[in-house]
Structure formats: C-alpha cells, structure tokens
Amino acid sequence: MTYRVKRLFLDSQEVKYFGTFQTEGEAKMRLAQVLEEAFDEQGIDSSEGRGQIEVAMRNGYYHFREDGKVTSWFMVEGE
C-alpha cells in the first residue's frame, strides 16, 4: 500500500497532490510540512499552528479555514 498527501479545494473541487509515500508515517510528515507552508502563506504564527499540525499528524487530515469557513481539506490517503 502507498500513501498520498493531497489538498481538496471545496469551492472548485480541485485536488493538489504533494507526493506518494511508502509508509503512512512518511506521508504524515509531508502533511505537516505542507500545512506549515499553508499557515505561512496565510500569515498564521508558527507557534499557533504547531498544535494544529500535531493534531493533523495524529488524525491524518486537517480542514483549513479562511474567514471562519472551511475552504479546503488536507489529508493522507491510502491507495
């Protein structure tokens, strides 16, 4: 089984992939990097985002909010 990291944009249904990995652990590490980059783009302080990234790594997904509404999902998906 392999694992992919992806982001699904809810408004357009566009999917962006961030790599394919041999283990779920590797994919979750990449998920953390992708989220950190997304937080930086949005100007979210890294210390504030760190706790959210830890939860995302445990769960394997994260819903991203902008202006109080969920705009996209980041997730690890097995295939």
Question: Where are these predicted regions, by residue range?
Answer:
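Short aromatic-glycine-(Arg/Gly/Cys) micro-motifs in beta-strand/loop hairpins
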Residues: 1-17, 69, 77
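Ser/Thr- (and often Asn-) enriched beta-sheet segments in non-cytosolic proteins
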Residues: 2, 20-22, 54
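Hydrophobic beta-strand residues in large extracellular and virion-surface proteins
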Residues: 5, 21, 27, 31, ...
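A short, charged, amphipathic alpha-helix used as a generic interaction element across diverse proteins
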Residues: 12-13, 22-45
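Short, mixed-charge low-complexity intrinsically disordered segments
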Residues: 35-79
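Generic structural signal for short, flexible, solvent-exposed coil/loop and linker residues
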Residues: 6-10, 24, 53
